[in-house]
Design a protein with these regions (language model features):
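An N-terminally biased module of ancient metal coordination in phosphate/nucleic-acid-related enzymes
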Residues: 1-79, 370-372, 381-384, 391-397, ...
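Histidine-centered divalent metal-coordination motifs
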Residues: 8-12, 138, 196
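Extended substrate/RNA-proximal surfaces in nucleic-acid metabolism proteins
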Residues: 2, 49-165, 398
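Short acidic/histidine-rich active-site segments
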Residues: 186-202
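Histidine/acidic-residue-rich catalytic or RNA/ligand-binding cores of hydrolases
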Residues: 15-17, 49-50, 144-150, 199-211
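C-terminal functional module detector
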Residues: 28, 46, 57-60, 70-72, ...
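Divalent metal-coordination and catalytic microenvironments
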Residues: 8, 42, 86, 134, ...
């Protein structure tokens, strides 16, 4: 069977996270996005565990509420500020891991994403001890990621590098970025939302399509490990330019700089603010390949833009959270079942019967790869622009649908 999976979210017990990030809300919103399995996130937090345990237990590591299945995950920050994503096979595994790290964390009961005074190798060793999967979260992000502080996997994970099976690309990178670094070729790439709110523009803005026998933790683990015929068949995510840290830019005024310009200015903007190195420039520093070399098993990467963002641009709204945008998004999802279906597969003529012409044309422009993206940087997301009608034939190649990828 084919499932869509988002393996990195946060609960309302994490800092800077919406109070609406409850199990009930996630279970309701995931199907409307087109997602079958959602990570719990924050599973070390005792209060969040109590909410998770309200779900029906499918097996030791898989839980069900409504139509949505959940698996146990968390993110932790090590002593070097590197974030790691962990997937657990059971609550007993979670409890064993928590017991090992509690004495190294001062906020394990107060923050869903705890700080742990251990390095990556030590955390990976504890993960291995409890049979959990571990890998770098949003690996290229310049603040709290592996490649922000390390130049290689082994620098971060030491002798446990061989145990690392996946890498989360993050919103400012895609497979073309990752596969310019040959040490990553053996790893499965994951694309996840890292959602801090359940809003359509955040939840499942990136996800993984997997071929599995059933929608359970063990089958998802086998897909990540590429075992028993299971695999990740498609990575779906934002164009890297939409990420907050794609290009090097000032974190105060968001002025963009080339790498040479930033170096010459000693990473200080003309406004006096700090210039933060972008993912694109960091990948260019790390890359040992001039162009991406994808291993045979690497799935295609499908770029996607959240439907609410497309609707907002079509209606001339400055925010994705206005009543007008919400109304049009809800109308479409009610008619076609999920956001993924609307963006990629629903018949455009049928869409035109449900929504206004401006929204139909915007969805069509996205499908045809004709949306212009102005890159993000310095902590500000990239923005999209809908081309004028006469410009649309010259912008980009046509965007494939999920069905197109399944045929290849």
């Amino acid at each position: 069977m084919i499932i869509n999976v988002d393996l990195h979210i946060h609960s309302h017990f994490s800092g800077a996270t919406s109070t609406s990030m409850t199990i009930e809300t996630l279970a309701r919103e995931a199907p409307r996005k087109g997602i079958d399995v959602v990570a719990t996130g924050d599973c070390l937090h005792s209060e969040w565990q109590r909410e998770i345990k309200q779900c029906e237990r499918i097996d030791e590591g898989t839980f069900l509420l409504g139509e949505t299945r959940f698996i146990l995950t968390t993110e932790v920050e090590d002593k070097n500020r590197v974030h790691h994503l962990l997937l657990f096979p059971s609550f007993s595994s979670v409890d064993d891991f928590k017991e090992r790290i509690t004495k190294f964390s001062s906020n394990i009961e107060t923050d869903g994403r705890p700080n742990v005074s251990l390095n990556g190798e030590q955390i990976a060793e504890f993960a291995k001890d409890v049979d959990a999967l571990i890998g770098p979260a949003h690996a290229f992000t310049p603040w709290t990621a592996m490649y922000a502080y390390h130049d290689s996997l082994s620098s971060c994970y030491g002798d446990l590098t061989r145990y690392i099976s996946f890498l989360e690309l993050g919103l400012s990178a895609d497979s073309n970025y990752g596969d310019r670094i040959s040490e990553l070729h053996r790893l499965t790439f994951l694309t996840n939302s890292d959602a801090h709110s359940p809003y359509p523009v955040r939840l499942a803005r990136e996800f993984n399509r997997m071929s599995v026998k059933e929608a359970t933790y063990r089958e998802i683990k086998n897909a990540i490990l590429r075992k028993n015929g299971n695999s990740v068949t498609l990575n779906v995510g934002l164009p890297p330019q939409e990420g907050k840290y794609n290009e090097s830019a000032c974190i105060s005024c968001f002025r963009h700089y080339t790498l040479d310009e930033a170096v010459k200015r000693r990473w200080r903007c003309i406004c006096g603010g700090r210039i933060k190195k972008g993912v694109r420039d960091r990948v260019n520093e790390l890359a040992d390949l001039p162009v991406p070399k994808h291993p045979e098993y690497r799935p295609p990467y499908l770029h996607i833009i959240p439907l609410a963002e497309i609707i907002a641009k079509a209606l001339g709204q400055n925010s994705t959270f206005t009543k007008k945008v919400t109304k049009r998004w809800t109308e479409l999802v009610d008619a076609f079942g999920s956001e993924v279906n609307i963006l990629l597969d629903a018949d455009i003529e049928e869409i035109s019967k449900v929504t206004v012409p401006a929204v139909t044309e915007a969805i069509k422009a996205f499908r045809e790869g004709k949306v212009i993206i102005h890159p993000g940087g310095g902590g500000r997301y990239g923005t999209i622009e809908l081309p004028n009608e006469e410009e649309r034939d010259t912008v980009r190649d046509k965007q494939k649908t999920l069905s197109d990828f399944l045929k290849t």
